[in-house]
Amino acid sequence: MDKLYLQLNLCTDIIEKGATCHTAKIAWLNEFCAAFHTFASKFKSYLIELAPKNELEGNIRIHVETIYLCFTQVITCITQLERTINIEGTLAAGAQLLATRTHFLDRIDWCLRRLQASVYQLAEEAIASTPVKLEDLSFVELLDLALDKLETYSEIVPAQSQAEQEDSDEIDQLVDHVNHLIKHALAFANVALESDKKALSAIYETVLEESGIFEKNFKTHNPNRRKLEALSLQPALYSLETYLNEALFDLIFTSMFDTEKASIKRLRNVLQSCESSGAVDGLLSDFDINVDRIQQIGIFAIAFTQDVKTKTIIRSCLASLESLDACIVPAFQLQTTSLASYHADILEHHFRQELMVFRNVIHEIIDSRALINNYLDILAESIDNAEKLYPKGYLLQVAQMGNVIYQHFQLRANNQELIADEEGKRLHQDFVAILHECQAVLEISVHVDLKRIIKRLKILYSILAKLRDVCDKLVYERAMSNNEKSMTTSTKLRQHSFANPEIGHTIANCNRTDSSDSLSHESDLISFQLTEILRIT
């Protein structure tokens, strides 16, 4: 244990040397990489003893996942520092990008301090485990706990006086689970589309009302009455999950399609051109909302996936975007020198890179059928209201939202099986063709007969519906070939429509390395991180 701390202190000393010596170059960065590689190697051996793979539960799992996040962030910042140093080599003698270096060095320093705290907490937890705080549980984990507890009340059992105190404790726990569920949901509602906020609010009120009734009457009601009230609360929780799924997809189509309206490139151009304060404020507001929405998409994506590598990549992307969000606008506003412009270039490149990785990993875990279904709903509503929407330009936005489906099937993990199927390959090609045709006819400046536009949108709808059916068929055939058995427990019967149930515990690399192989278990994640360090150096 002491050796880990000593090695981590050595890493911190090297980073501090880079912060005070502004002429530190690649040799200094390689020195840090070597020291950090040694620490990571020692930690890997230590982790196997401290927390075997099958014992990564509770707070131990939380601390290990925090350590994985810090590893990934350190590696990300190393990559950006290497790029910064290489750019400095092309500048005039002695020119240094101090603001850029400071940004990434501060992030590495924070990660090293967090690593030290997490390693200590991990050791303490291995000696004497502590209960996991509800604040540390995800929406899905809280929902599973709440439904499992309700399941016990749905079964009528003879009353037992000796269990009264246990029952009282359990109802308190159930109420706490529901309250924390609502906290997660409210955070999501703050950035949800206006069209979803009203429905979400109504569902929250229903859940809280049913939970309050169940708690209020718990002690006075017999098991039969408790069962009836449990059966009322269960569907309210299912409704909450279902509508959050749908609202999450709506957010994905809006935030991932709306890259031009709130793009980092457009924001920089507007700030550089010194446009009116109203235009700047509007774009800044759009940008901030989009970043907040991406954060919520990431939080729920983490909740819906079980793969530790996927969670780590998403967390790292969110951490990078959050860190950049605080400094990228000032960097764009202060481009008064060539060095300031280089600083803005590096931050913009980093932001776009993290956003691309984030988008790809989200597409990796999304269920293709659920994504198509959501877009079909958007298309159907738009076709029904085409006369009102066409003059406002909304039909063009709807057609452009189809790019999210296009991007989804550009990834090998999502199209490999589809294009291997003759019908699937043909329908995918037809989808791409009609999508581009719909966008083209809506983008031209001359007026086009609305009937022609509706006809194309209906063709797009028909092709997508058939494509979804092919995806259904492929999933069914795979299930039959694998001789999959149906699950029986109450929580496993729920299928989270956001995440692809076929992913299991592996996922493609999402462009973090050149390899496309998936990691099959959690201990491989550290090896993955070490490979990244060796690749960089």
Curated annotation (Swiss-Prot):
GO molecular function annotations of the record: actin filament binding; beta-catenin binding
GO BP annotation list: actin filament organization; cell migration; cell-cell adhesion; cellularization
Record carries keyword Cytoplasm: yes
Coiled coil: none
Gene Ontology CC entries for this record: adherens junction; catenin complex; cleavage furrow; cytosol
InterPro entries: Serendipity_A
Pfam families: Serendipity_A (PF05482)
Membrane topology of this protein: Peripheral membrane protein
Keywords attached to this entry: Cell membrane, Cytoplasm, Developmental protein, Membrane
Record's subcellular location: Cytoplasm; Cell membrane
Role of this protein: Required for the cellularization of the syncytial blastoderm embryo. Involved in the localization of the actin filaments just prior to and during plasma membrane invagination. Sry-alpha together with nullo and bnk may provide auxiliary functions, by acting both to stabilize a large and dynamic microfilament structure and regulate its functions.
Name of this chain's protein: Serendipity locus protein alpha
Gene of this entry: Sry-alpha
